[in-house]
Amino acid sequence: MSDEEEEATPLVCDNGSGLVKAGFAGDDAPRAVFPSIVGRPRHQGVMVGMGQKDAYVGDEAQSKRGILTLKYPVEHGIVTNWDDMEKVWHHTFYNELRIAPEENPCLLTEAPLNPKANREKMTQIMFETFNSPAMYVCIQAVLCLYASGRTTGIVLDSGDGVSHTVPIYEGYAMPHAILRLDLAGRELTNYLMRVMCDRGYAFVTTAEREIVRDIKEKLGYVALDFEQEMLTAATSTSLEKSYELPDGQVITIGNERFRCAEALFQPSFLGMESAGVHETVYNSIMKCDIDVRKDLYANNVLSGGTTMFPGIGDRMQKEMVALAPSTMKIKIIAPPERKYSCWIGGSILASLSTFASMWIKKSEYDEAGPAIVHRKCF
């Protein structure tokens, strides 16, 4: 590795299903955070000289959402549309970070238990389209643990497209005990759209979904006792909040505030037959060796945007205490910066001097092809 490659600051790009978090290794927060959205006009452009584009990315797509059809290139943590994904990366490098990707090594993240082809294609695009000097793909949950300063713990990482529980002991992930749940922020938003429709508020288009997402983020919370909370909501107006829509209309939101997030603990609300997040964490711990369980119970790390609901830590504590053996000490760790903890972990990892030997170099890629990513990235 030549000297000038050593000096270039590595980039860290956490491509979530909902948000792209990107920045430079060594920083304590991502420089650029924008929605992982590509929007295409759904109407004919008639005014000349407007500089209309055939596609908009991120915040610009968000601000023009009234005339666009919005698509998310990443679904359930898996890239489903590579052309759009390239647009998102291009936007990240050239417009947001304003750097040349051929000069900086790039650390990317991905969800555990993703199809192998996904990371191969990522590697291929980085080296062939963007000419990266070096790159690396890391599992999101492992980075979250780095960010919390632990080497042992079970991470519940719940973003927009996928939730997963990853038990890690002394720095080793236990692949047999990793569980994945395709229930996360986007499903909750869709569920809230349905619930609001039952109330007579019609939210249908891709642009209106973004309004519902905002309602969810601003007003949603997790009830400690769901039945009790439903009673409270039915008998008093203390839980009601009002929200102003972009056109000035004001709507009131009552029990929808906590019914939405409750689906994390009761996926049957969404018509899913899977276990809730608390049971998934428990099942994941039970798949581990009996000797490591105690340490996992005491280090439950929450991360990702969907764990930002107020009250989720207390509810998680209550549910875990009910599932675990009675003498077990349970601790839920919910760091305030957990929305970005995966990115922060990547920033820490990429700036370690010992990590320099881990990068996949362009020369190695040219020799072995995309499959090298399975050899070098754990």
From Swiss-Prot:
Signal sequence region: none
Keywords: ATP-binding, Cytoplasm, Cytoskeleton, Hydrolase, Muscle protein, Nucleotide-binding
Annotated catalysed reactions: ATP + H2O = ADP + phosphate + H(+)
Gene Ontology molecular functions: ATP binding; hydrolase activity
Main location: cytoplasm
Enzyme Commission number, as recorded: 3.6.4.-
Alphabetical list of InterPro entries matching this protein: Actin, Actin/actin-like_CS, Actin_CS, ATPase_NBD
GO annotation, cellular component aspect: cytoplasm; cytoskeleton
Compartments, record wording: Cytoplasm, Cytoskeleton
Function: Actins are highly conserved proteins that are involved in various types of cell motility and are ubiquitously expressed in all eukaryotic cells.
Similarity comment text for this entry: Belongs to the actin family.
Full protein name: Actin, muscle
Organism annotation: Branchiostoma floridae
